[in-house]
Amino acid sequence: MSNGLKVKKRNGRGTESLNLEKMHKMVEEACKGIAGVSASQVEIQSGIQFYDGITTQEIQEILIKSASDLIDLDHPNYQFVAARLLLFALRKSLYGKMRELPHLESHIMSCTNRDVYDKDIFTKYSKEEIDKANSYIDHERDFLFTYAGLRQVVDKYLVQDRSGGGVYE
């Protein structure tokens, strides 16, 4: 379902019609299993901010802000909705998808190929050590963050391109 607005793709390859159903599914997924929240409220809060030519990244940022604006004493669980929306945006930006996250070795290789990490990292750690570190990673725990907690991790601890604003890990 579309309302006639065009959206610029995150990858920069053209435009498509604003797909409200796709947006709704993402917000529903962010609200899934959380008591006292409503996907409709997040969507209503964000709806008036869309314009022709908006990017998918801007839509994601509007949805995150809309959910975070709903956090108050009576509705504290919107902090988890906003966190999930931020997490979805991070994963999409980093890996191009929200699920099927890469093995740690693949991610390190990607970062060394882009000169984010020093290639010397592979002389410091063996494949077995990287595999062992990967075995400790449980991406489902990412969903335990509150919005404030995840925002702090992103702003303070993730490797970022300070000039372009991109996040590398």
Residue ranges and their predicted role:
Residues 1-169:
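Extended catalytic cores of very large enzyme megasubunits
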